[in-house]
């Protein structure tokens, strides 16, 4: 708000609920819809979704994609397999145990940090991925890239995000018309 009041040119990297703010982000909703659809097409029905703060715009976008995939595939989400607002390792560990008791076929993690913790807990319990349970993530990072076995995850190009944001803010400074929201591919 301060930057807008002072007419300082800026863009946000990531999505925001602020109106009139130029946003550059990846298309999280579409990416998560596609990954969830693929998992459903592989015949998995008992999918647990584990994630963080649902007040975050990125979590909301990813959740919309997840829901849209179920709708597109004509499937019904089991609300007892949705676990959001998990904010610490202890809670995530407890949820992993609960998901295993509920015989989930796949754990779908909202991001790499959650996924990393899920994998650690599965290793501690001697649960084999993908033999005993499948694991996928809505966000990839170096944390997951080196995991053995590899984890199916969505990759977003952070370098491209920065370059597009830089070009956009330069265009704003030069007075050019720019889109208020730019969604990049995955």
Roles of regions detected by a PLM:
Residues 4-186:
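Bacterial carbohydrate/catabolite-sensing allosteric modules
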